[in-house]
Curated annotation (Swiss-Prot):
Organism: Influenza A virus (strain A/Goose/Guangxi/345/2005 H5N1 genotype G)
Quaternary context: Binds M1 protein. May interact with human nucleoporin RAB/HRB and exportin XPO1/CRM1.
Any one of the GO BP annotations: exit of virus from host cell nucleus through nuclear pore
Function: Mediates the nuclear export of encapsidated genomic RNAs (ribonucleoproteins, RNPs). Acts as an adapter between viral RNPs complexes and the nuclear export machinery of the cell. Possesses no intrinsic RNA-binding activity, but includes a C-terminal M1-binding domain. This domain is believed to allow recognition of RNPs to which the M1 protein is bound.
Signal peptide as annotated in the record: none
Chain ranges for the short sequence motif Nuclear export signal as given in the UniProt record: 8-17, 81-90
Subcellular location(s) per record: Virion; Host nucleus
UniProt keyword list: Host nucleus, Host-virus interaction, Transport, Virion
Family: Belongs to the influenza viruses NEP family.
Name by which UniProt lists this protein: Nuclear export protein
Other known facts: Average number present in a viral particle is estimated to be 130-200 molecules.
InterPro entries on file: Flu_NS2
Gene Ontology cellular component annotations, sorted alphabetically: host cell nucleus; virion component
Pfam families: Flu_NS2
């Protein structure tokens, strides 16, 4: 998924969209943020039993996890909306792949968080 993230982010950054580039840049920033968060959850799971370390680093990790799930749901809805309104096939493919990747990341985050609980 790392190469998928990089590929989609690169393609999204090159799109000339009819809507605000600030919106697109915000989406790209959120994508990157979610990727980093998913990676940190994965690292905690790899060090299995690292819940104590996660809690020590971030006492409000459950609240942060909840916020990240809200953020990913918002991104999924935003990408779905963009997919519906765009007529450009390149953009449609990019947003479709972004949607698939977001759904995969959401599932990975759920799996990691259940393993930590």
């Amino acid at each position: 998924t790392v190469s998928s993230f990089q590929d989609i982010l690169m393609r999204m950054s090159k799109m000339q969209l009819g809507y605000s580039s600030e919106d697109l840049n915000g989406m790209i920033t959120r994508f990157e943020s979610l990727k980093l968060y998913r990676d940190s959850l994965g690292e905690a799971v790899i060090r299995m039993g690292d819940l104590h370390s996660l809690q020590t680093r971030n006492g409000k990790w459950r609240e942060q996890l909840s916020h990240k799930f809200e953020e990913i749901r918002w991104l999924i809805e935003e990408v779905r909306h963009r997919l519906k309104i765009t007529e450009n096939s390149f953009e449609q493919i990019t947003f479709m792949q972004a949607l698939q990747l977001l759904l995969e990341v959401e599932q990975e985050m759920r799996t990691f968080s259940f393993q930590l609980i």
